[in-house]
Amino acid sequence: MRSKTLIDRIEGEASLYLEMAQGRVAKAHIAFPHFRGMERILEGRKAADALVITPRVCGICGHAHLMAAARAIESAYEAAGKPIMLSPKAEAIRELTLVLEMIQNHFKWLYLVILPELSKLGIGGLPQTPLKGAFAASLATKVLALFAGQWPHSSYMLPGGVTCDPTHLERVRAVGMLDELAAFFERETAGTPLENILAMESCKSFNPMQSDLGLLEHGLLAAHMHEKGFAHDRFIVLGEHGFSTAARVLQTRRRKADAALVQTESAVCPDERTYADNVRYDGGFYEAGPLARAMAGDVTLIKNMHRRKGASDP
């Protein structure tokens, strides 16, 4: 049996085609039918135009694209023998705003997407509090706006640094809101201080938590979600930041990663025209994203969960 499902909780729209056999997915194809073509739009333009155009490829992670554009231009200068050195302040502001974008995205994804969708699958006992996600995301965005201005499509990064120079009052406001955000996470999401989370080394420490994260884990295990949808058990991180380094992980073995080994090719969907690309590393598919960063960063709790629950552990 074949079925088509529209995927609309992404930036853009995609079609997912599934072939079912005995109640299981036998084949899957995904199509992105709308051409976006930022790389085509940039052809023939001045390099600085990328700082404005590239972030608009996505309303969810514009800061990541802005940083990629700024770094690409800086790399071009370096290749031309004119390296650009960032000041420690500019580097710190770039890192802070990028992390804040990730944080607000994670809060929205958890409370506005994951928990409601899992409840639709019949997993009971999960918190249905979408306003928690909206509140936490707004706090992160307010801090981000102090340094980057408008959100989501900020253009405050330039080759060599940033356009902002935060005042003492702005820094104090940022620290206050960050403290409020951390306290919210500890109270509502984790149910325990951050120090306790970071010190955990085993699933056994996580299981008794009566918090939104604890209830989520209980629901996922009760529904046997950790036994479904196994991937290749290969993870990759290519971004070089204060919180991550380029690496790949095969099961639990950490290896070096070289961006030169990334290959792209046009994807094929037999049911619909698609403008997507398949991306491989040295010929193989790898998982990227938050789990990959935790695995490559040797986060003990996450690696323990992965080892005990398997490669599909959400």
Language model feature labels by segment:
Residues M1-P314:
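Active-site bordering "gate/hinge" segments
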